[in-house]
Regions:
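Cysteine-centered iron-sulfur cluster-binding motifs in ferredoxin-type domains/subunits
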Residues: 19-38, 65, 69-89, 338-339
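Short His/Asp/Glu-rich catalytic/ion-coordination signatures at enzyme active sites or charged loops
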Residues: 60, 84, 217
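N-terminal glycine-rich anion-binding loops that anchor highly charged ligand groups
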Residues: 29-33, 43-48, 200-202
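Iron-sulfur cluster-binding electron-transfer modules in prokaryotic oxidoreductases
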Residues: 15, 91-407
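Generic structural signal for well-ordered, non-membrane alpha-helices
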Residues: 30-33, 53, 137, 253
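Short, surface-exposed helix-loop/turn micro-motifs enriched in polar/charged residues
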Residues: 43, 47, 83-86, 243, ...
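Non-heme iron-sulfur electron-transfer modules
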Residues: 1-14, 37-70, 88-117, 394-400
């Protein structure tokens, strides 16, 4: 796809990067077949090809309106289109650039600005998020439905973590929402890894991965959080930590992008590249281990929801399923497993109606095999699916750790 950049855009390094990405697109339309928002809305501009045209028009100096912004905002960034694309278009990078340019040219309505700023001020701050969640649980009957649905109906308390006692050590990003919404997930991870001879090292100075800010178009703030995490992890990396572990695939996908996002930062480019190389999802670590050491036999019938950030962003489709099968669990078939559940970070709050439709479609697919429980690998998906109030939804490592306790 050829573009005629304006003089303003020729002076913009990110616009030049967008132009190079656009050139890979042959506008074949394969991407529309797997785009969740196109399937729901049937509008070309709510599919990847249409959004690519919109970004092209922005780069060429056409009028940028609230409608332009709306169509770009509706994208889930599920990256299903990238899995489908035969030309290897880096759509998510293009979308990030397009959204950033449009954000500078179009002033959002006040309610939108307030919601986005509120999310940015609350979600990445664990103490604030925890306090407001506790208040929300008390006030649940009086809250709007889309907010009420995001509050956990139940949480499993975090079990004690084992001491640091093994030579093999990994760092773990604790996350910002997960410690409140699913407090036992990281503890369960540490307990399973301990049985495999791996200790999880704390890095208390590390915080939010930066995805919340970045995807709400506060991209510089997101990059600042990335730099903070690199600084927090660096001493442990120099001391020999073998990996930076992520138990939430959304965070993992973002940390793996640090190298790309900070490639032009002279102070952080090399460190960011090394951090991205060390970043692994939990399943990447476990699949290489002798799981027989755990001596468990899974006794549950599960449906696994593979998050978009695991299957499309990190290209780990099918890997959790393989681990669960090795451990003896029974897995049901899930129709249309490639489609997004509608969580998409904060999307369920910024676009509640679309998110609810996608959630209900996904729950129907997950429940079609009549599982005892649904498991997933990302806190956003877990919370969003659980908000339907149907089959119980947990992180898959908690079910593994639960089976471990029975032995």
């Amino acid at each position: 796809m050829q573009t005629q950049l304006t003089e303003e855009m020729r002076q913009n390094a990110r616009a030049l990067e967008a132009d190079s990405i656009l050139r890979a697109c042959v506008h074949c339309g394969f991407c529309t077949a797997t785009c969740p928002t196109y399937q729901l809305l049937g509008d070309e501009l709510d599919g990847p090809r249409g959004r690519i045209y919109l970004i092209k028009q922005v780069l060429e100096g056409n009028d940028v309106t609230l409608k332009t912004q709306e169509h770009l905002d509706r994208c889930l960034t599920c990256r299903n289109c990238e899995t489908t694309c035969p030309s290897g278009v880096r759509y998510h990078n293009l979308l990030d650039i397009g959204r950033d340019i449009v954000e500078q040219k179009v002033k959002r309505p006040l309610p939108e600005r307030m919601l986005r700023e509120g999310l940015r001020q609350v979600v990445p701050r664990p103490a604030v998020f925890r306090a407001l969640t506790q208040v929300g649980l008390v006030l649940r009957p009086f809250l709007p439905e889309q907010v009420r649905a995001k509050l956990p109906a139940e949480t499993v308390k975090a079990k004690p973590r084992p001491p640091l006692r093994h030579k093999r050590r990994v760092l773990m990003l604790e996350g910002c929402a997960q410690p409140t919404l699913s407090p036992n997930t990281n503890a369960a991870t540490a307990r399973v890894l301990d049985r495999l001879g791996i200790s999880v090292m704390p890095a208390n100075e590390a915080g939010c991965c930066g995805a919340v800010d970045y995807h709400l178009n506060a991209q510089e703030k997101g990059l600042a959080r990335a730099r903070n995490n690199i600084d927090a992890w660096w001493p442990a990396i120099e001391a020999g930590a073998e990996a930076i572990l992520q138990t939430a695939s959304g965070c993992g996908a973002f940390v793996k992008e640090y190298g790309q996002m900070l490639k032009n930062d002279a102070l952080y480019a090399d460190k960011a590249r090394q951090v991205s190389e060390l970043a692994v999802d939990l399943v990447e670590l476990l699949r290489e281990e002798l799981l027989e050491k755990l001596a468990i036999r899974g006794d549950k019938k599960l449906a696994f929801h593979c998050p978009c950030t695991l299957q499309h962003a990190q290209k780990l489709n099918g890997e959790v399923e393989k681990v669960l099968l090795r451990l003896g669990f029974t897995l049901t078939d899930v129709p249309d497993s490639h489609l997004c559940c509608g969580s998409a970070g904060t999307y369920a709050l910024t676009h509640p109606d679309l998110a609810r439709q996608l959630r209900d479609n996904k729950m129907n697919a997950l429940e079609s095999g009549k599982p005892e429980m649904i498991v997933t690998a990302n806190i956003g998906c877990q919370t969003h699916l659980a908000s339907a109030g149907r089959t119980s939804v947990r992180h898959w490592i908690e079910i593994v750790e639960q089976a471990l306790e029975k032995e």
